[in-house]
């Protein structure tokens, strides 16, 4: 428990409470907790690997259920995010995870959100049972390429990950057909499934990662791929890169590219290719694409179709829809676009309208626009240097 004097307005009550966003934009507080940090696997990138000499603990099913209910009653949380290290075997661990969700739903009539981590290698029966009580199931791919997974986690393979993914997908599709025939059939994993990849622990390029993500999104039940910048926890293992800090900028760029794939109708080959296998860390992927294709710009904001407006840097989905709706009544200028929410600092170089000057990407060149939009690096000041500020008031 935190010391009372260290807690103030807005402090999270427990470190185990995390925040997730629902598809409708709501922020949900979740109790993020592990059943146990014991594990039979010795994955090089994991702090809970078998060979690590760290404190270990295991919660019983009843302890987890009681903890969740108490937090829920006190309005600390709106749901549970439950994962676990693998003890004994995948089925044994998965059975305990299912029991937690089952007891919450059936015994305590818990109607909050439940996200369960499905254990790779668990049986179809247990995955199907978990889907009856969980809102979302996830199976983590962890390392995008199997040869690199084998290098860092020799006891694992991608087959054990993709198999439960297929179980979940088949369960959702079967449930959808059953609900057409019978009204009272319980829903199966209504929030779909997700997965996660570790970024920076191995040699995969952003191109490799995004092509894998794109193929996963072809499956109707895959709602989200998460990217986690590698945190250097086992520095003694020579198979791992020596990173001073997690690649957070790269992680953010992957999320931006992922957003373009899911909502902006981009294809992977438009974002990364053989010439540009990694995302630019200085600019976002949409701006990067626009600067590589100056021949497509500028576009007339009062005439262009929705799909092309979406591709303009500084214009999001909501703004694009408002532009289409608003221009039916009058022509849009600088003031109207800014009021709609367009980031004119970026967009002005890629669009034309009545009031904008003609300093577009074609006049300034992509290099010139990039120079204007990339923030200048701040000069580092030697902390040992004494700085004297002289003002007229002294």
Regions found by a protein language model. Name each.
Residues 94-102, 106, 131-140, 200-219, ...:
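Short, electropositive alpha-helical surface patch
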Residues 145, 160-237, 246-272:
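Conserved C-terminal portion of the radical SAM core fold
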Residues 17-47, 72, 79, 195:
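N-terminal pre-triad scaffold of radical SAM enzymes
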Residues 240-310, 346-377, 383-390:
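Long, highly charged, low-complexity intrinsically disordered interaction regions
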Residues 49-64, 71-97, 103-124, 131-182, ...:
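Core AdoMet radical
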Residues 2-9, 13:
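Single conserved hydrophobic/aromatic residue that forms the stacking wall/gate
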Residues 326-327:
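Residue-level signature of tetratricopeptide-repeat
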């Amino acid at each position: 428990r935190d010391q009372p004097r260290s807690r103030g307005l807005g402090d999270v009550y427990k470190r185990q409470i995390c925040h997730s966003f629902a598809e409708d934009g709501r922020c949900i507080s979740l109790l993020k907790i592990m059943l146990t940090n014991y594990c039979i696997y010795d994955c090089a990138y994991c702090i809970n690997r078998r060979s690590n000499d760290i404190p270990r603990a295991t919660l019983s099913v009843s302890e987890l259920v009681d903890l969740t209910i108490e937090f829920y009653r006190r309005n600390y949380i709106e749901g549970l995010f439950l994962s676990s290290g693998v003890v004994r075997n995948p089925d044994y661990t998965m059975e305990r995870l299912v029991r937690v969700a089952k007891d919450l739903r059936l015994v305590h009539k818990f109607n909050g959100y439940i996200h369960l981590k499905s254990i790779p290698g668990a049986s179809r029966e247990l995955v199907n049972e978990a889907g009856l009580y969980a809102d979302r199931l996830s199976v983590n791919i962890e390392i995008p390429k199997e040869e690199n997974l084998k290098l860092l986690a020799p006891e694992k393979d991608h087959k054990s990950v993709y198999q439960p993914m297929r179980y979940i997908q088949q369960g959702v599709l079967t449930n959808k057909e059953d609900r057409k025939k019978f009204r009272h059939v319980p829903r199966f994993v209504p929030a779909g499934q997700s997965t996660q990849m570790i970024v920076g622990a191995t040699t995969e390029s952003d191109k490799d990662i995004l092509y894998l993500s794109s193929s996963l999104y072809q499956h109707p039940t895959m709602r989200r791929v998460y990217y986690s910048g590698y945190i250097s926890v086992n520095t003694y293992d020579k198979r791992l890169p020596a990173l001073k800090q997690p690649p957070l900028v790269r992680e953010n760029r992957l999320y931006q590219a992922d957003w373009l794939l899911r909502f902006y109708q981009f294809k992977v080959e438009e974002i990364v290719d053989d010439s540009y296998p990694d995302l630019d860390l200085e600019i976002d992927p949409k701006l990067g694409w626009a600067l590589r294709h100056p021949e497509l710009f500028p576009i007339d904001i009062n005439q262009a179709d929705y799909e092309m407006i979406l591709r303009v840097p500084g214009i999001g989905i909501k703004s694009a829809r408002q532009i289409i709706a608003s221009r039916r009544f009058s022509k849009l200028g600088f003031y109207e676009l800014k009021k709609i929410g367009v980031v004119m600092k970026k967009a002005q170089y890629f669009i034309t309208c009545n009031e904008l000057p003609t300093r577009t990407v074609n006049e300034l060149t992509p290099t010139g626009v990039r120079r204007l939009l990339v923030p200048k690096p701040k000069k580092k000041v030697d902390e040992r240097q004494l700085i004297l500020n002289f003002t007229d008031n002294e």
